[in-house]
Amino acid sequence: MSFSVTLPDGSKKEFDKAVSVKEVASSIATSLGKAAVGAKVNGQVKPLDYEIDSDVEIAIITDKDEEGLDILRATAAFAFEAVAKKKYPELRLGQHVADEGGFYVDTDKKDQIKVTELPELEKAMEKLIKSGQPIEHVVMDKSELEEMFKDDPFKSDLLKKIDSDKVDAYKLGDFVDFGFDALLPNTGKIKHFKLLSVAGAYWLGKSSNPMLQRIFGTAFFKEAALKEDLKRRAEIKERDHRTIGRDLDLFFVDPKVGAGLPYWMPKGATIRRVVERYIIDREVADGYKHVYTPVLMNLDAYKTSGHWAHYRDDMFPPMDMGDGEMLELRPMNCPSHIQIYKHHIRSYRDLPLRVAELGMMHRYEKSGALSGLQRVREMTLNDGHTFVELDQVQSEFAKILKLIMDVYRDFDITDYYFRLSYRDPKNTDKYFANDEMWERSQKMLKGAMDDLGLDYVEAEGEAAFYGPKLDIQTKTALGNDETMSTIQLDFMLPERFGLTYVGKDGEEHRPVMVHRGIVGTMERFIAYLTEIYKGAFPTWLAPVQAEIIPVNNEAHGEYAEKVRQELAKRGFRVEVDDRNEKMGYKIRESQTQKVPYTLVLGDEEMKNGSVNVRRYGTDEEISKSLDDFINEIDADVKSYSREN
């Protein structure tokens, strides 16, 4: 027997008998043999003891590789399973996942594991790690595993998904589990780890399945990396809009009433209203006609648009109204704006026709994907569509992009890049079938960006089903890539809906439709702002811009109300805290609620017609006249908006 192993640099090593991954690594270099934690064999991750006896391509994995971290974290998950099963014999284990985010294990137990129990489980894992117990890789008959897990519905479910008679499994003493690509050869290799949190998760992500408990953790080869990761996670937790939304009473979601359906509390509604008014004013100033259109539409419109064929899985089921009428909750606003266009006969003099709306939409998101305001089932999109002549496309594109950049400047959004999103040429079935249209529109989009001299990346497979688009990708406060804005060229929908305009030649022509979103949905945008600002919104956005605290309600309450009225009539959002609480407590509460200005009013202030001002985040108190404070807060508001 003779075979060759091809290395990443193209070189080959010849062997005349079966060898393990570790032996291949050692044959390359003794140091590599010691550093190896696994390998990619023909693209698949394999453990160190995996045997090779034929021609293969191989890339050795060490602790320097991302796959090495995955192997480490999978081993940590396996070790957690072993100690958890020993501590709670009645515990049933579900699926386990290890990736760039760490690892998690789904568990089922009558009395759920409390987060306060995690340190005890960590100690058990540390003891197991110090013992350096061997982890044995075995290939077992599927039937043997089925018998072993016959009373475990979760493992039985997972085994049903395996179509091979042989299954890779791992043993640690009497404990056995399967579903791992590769694990380290003993527990002593796990090094630095942390159990992080617990959460609920439906089995296999389906809301019709039982709710299990998901235990999250992470692991690293180096202690410094673990410490840095934990620091990053603390920052993420501090910025999480769901936590801030709860603490500042901005919004809530009650799964019992409806998962993915947020309720906006007064403060959250105020922030949203300020953003919406800002957006509408900017768009109207830019020539857009703002409209309102119904959230329900005849299903035939979505069959014509192609949404029903290409987007059905993300739409709610249609409502049968009888007599053949089928109504659909709209997942997108474009067919509605097309009806606005079609309502009148259009001439070239009407173009560009810019239609905009804060349009409410509904999309069927799986319950497991829902998250705060970022992933919801009901959303309001800052949507707009421009109908143009062909020779107006590039100038309109530039105009829309300028509007987006102006908005970004006002909200201080600086961390972004441009992505041209094309269809996937290898999977054209999910797109509108017109090669000429795709080539033409992709070329026009690219040309518009090149004419503006802007850098961009190109991404195949990220286009909408009806046309290519420019996506503006922002970096969230939590470090995630997110599409904030889009500009999209569409030759398809005007054709499908028979849109026309009368040209200068008196003949009918087909307009081009430009879809655009400036800040996406209100829900996602406000989640983004909440995390960027950590809930400390700039004064122009803050739900309460000034909090007035009278030292004594009886003595100073009337003056406090006078100051409130004076500020309110100038358009500032101001409240009086006249609760029967200690003044120090009320001041701390104002700071906790991240109110930009706290005004304390006592005898001195009432006598002089002044206010004692404390800015959020400082301990400094400054006494000034009410007029001076009004000038200060007015300048502050204008410094964050286009008014200055």
From Swiss-Prot:
Any single GO CC term annotated in Swiss-Prot or TrEMBL for this entry: cytoplasm
Function: Catalyzes the attachment of threonine to tRNA(Thr) in a two-step reaction: L-threonine is first activated by ATP to form Thr-AMP and then transferred to the acceptor end of tRNA(Thr). Also edits incorrectly charged L-seryl-tRNA(Thr).
Entries under InterPro entries matching the protein: aa-tRNA-synt_IIb (IPR002314), aa-tRNA-synth_II (IPR006195), aa-tRNA-synth_II/BPL/LPL (IPR045864), Anticodon-bd (IPR004154), Anticodon-bd_dom_sf (IPR036621), Beta-grasp_dom_sf (IPR012675), TGS (IPR004095), TGS-like (IPR012676)
NCBIfam families registered for this protein in UniProt: thrS (TIGR00418)
Positions annotated to bind Zn(2+): C334, H385, H515
Upper lineage: Bacteria, Bacillati, Bacillota, Bacilli, Lactobacillales
Enzyme Commission number, as recorded: 6.1.1.3
Localization, UniProt: Cytoplasm
Protein name as catalogued: Threonine--tRNA ligase
Stored Pfam families: HGTP_anticodon (PF03129), TGS (PF02824), tRNA-synt_2b (PF00587), tRNA_SAD (PF07973)
Keyword Zinc: yes
Family per similarity comment: Belongs to the class-II aminoacyl-tRNA synthetase family.
Quaternary state and interactors: Homodimer.
Keywords: Aminoacyl-tRNA synthetase, ATP-binding, Cytoplasm, Ligase, Metal-binding, Nucleotide-binding, Protein biosynthesis, RNA-binding, tRNA-binding, Zinc
Cofactor binding, note field: Binds 1 zinc ion per subunit.
GO annotation, biological process: threonyl-tRNA aminoacylation
Annotated segments matching region Catalytic: 240-538
